[in-house]
Structure formats: C-alpha cells, structure tokens
Design a protein with these regions (language model features):
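Acidic, low-complexity intrinsically disordered regions
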Residues: 1-219
Length: 219
C-alpha cells in the first residue's frame, strides 16, 4: 500500500437538466481541485462525465497536472446513465488496483458521485450489480463513496446501490446549492485524505448541505 496516495474519482452529471448550472459546476469543481492541490499527500484524479453516454475526462491524472475544467469539457445534453457511469468507474478502479504492485496501490480510494436526477438511460449495469460491486470494495478494501443527489430522496436512492445513509445527501440544484455542495465535498475529501481511516468521518460532513436545503424548503 502506498501511504498518502489517494485515488479521487469524481462522477459528474451533465445531463440536460443541469442546463443553466454549467458555470456553477465548473467553478465549484475547479475550486475543489485548487483546495486539494494545496494539501499534502499525493492524489490521482479520475473524472467521469455522464449523460446518456459515459465519458472519461481525466484518467488517473496526477493532481498537480489536472488543468481547470472548461466549457469545452463540461456541457449539458441527453439523459441520465447514472448506473453505467458508476459501474464504469468502479470497474476501472478495481482493475487498476488489482493489477498494480502492492507497493503502488493507493492507500485510499474516494468516489464522489453527483447527479440531479434519477437513473433513466443505463444499458450495461443494473442496481443490483452496482450494489454488489460497491459493497465488496467498501467491505474488503475500505473504499469511500459519497452520493449527492438533487430532485430525489438521495438517501433512498443511494441505498439501492449500496451507499449508506451517512454517505448520501440531498442538495438544492441551483447556483447556491451547487456552491455549497462543492465547498463541503472539498472539505470532506481533505478530511478523508488526512484521516488515518476514512471511516472515522461521520455523518456530520453533510450537515451544511442539509441545512441549506432545509432552509430553502422551510423544513
């Protein structure tokens, strides 16, 4: 195991319903990268964009070498192949970690999955298959999965593919909500990278996102 090395996998929704939030998403993602670059320790960045198709944007780029996201990279279209994006990312990282020498395997693997809508376009992966894949990596290797969903019961949806309630949160899909999202995600990823064990980070990580959502909905 290579100490202080993190594999950070971001799975970003760019389906048509994200229209109008392109700049907010780009700005939030770039701010997160900047924050991570300031932190000690190594990290490889994998970024997967999805609509009705899945696109690999960054393929384990060293963190310091990742250029800012631009409008040429992130533009919206199509439907929501959420399961295919998650399945592709997990399958890819499993293959990488299994085939690397033990001394080169990342100490931590963190997935951040962000979507504003429910699955409606996947062809390769089912909920059950994703659940088995995620549960295996969590239980055997301590991988972390954060799920941030808008326009849905995010906790209920995350449970369908094996992500526990303390790692799932519903956010408000507008400029303010997206900004809060990325601020919290950046802070949480930093804490996970620094912590001796990611599991030591409890459900408190998502309190700011929950408070923002509840404030706007008076609940």
């Amino acid at each position: 195991m290579k100490k202080n090395l993190t594999e950070l996998v971001s799975i970003l929704d760019r389906s048509g319903s994200m229209g109008g939030l392109e700049q907010d998403t780009i700005g939030g993602f770039n701010a997160m990268l900047t924050r991570q670059k300031e932190q000690e320790g190594e990290a490889n960045v994998t970024t997967i964009l999805f609509d009705h198709e899945v696109q690999l944007l960054h393929d384990r780029f060293p963190l310091h070498a990742v250029a800012p996201l631009t409008e040429k990279d992130y533009y919206v279209r199509g439907c929501t192949a959420l399961l295919d994006a998650i399945g592709y990312g997990v399958e890819k990282m499993v293959n990488i970690q299994r085939h690397l020498p033990e001394s080169e395997r990342a100490e931590k693997v963190i997935f951040v999955i962000t979507t504003d809508g429910l699955e409606n376009a996947s062809k390769r992966f089912s909920y059950e298959k994703i659940r088995r894949m995620i549960e295996r990596e969590k239980e055997q290797y301590g991988w972390e999965f954060l799920f941030l969903g808008a326009n849905m019961d995010a906790v209920k949806e995350a449970a369908r593919f094996g992500i526990s309630s303390d790692r799932a949160v519903r956010f408000e899909n507008d400029a303010q909500g997206v900004a809060v999202n990325y601020h919290v995600v950046s802070e949480t990823v930093s804490r996970m990278r620094e912590a001796p064990c990611c599991a030591s980070i409890g459900a408190e990580w998502k309190e700011q996102i929950e408070a923002d959502f509840q404030k706007r909905h008076h609940r």
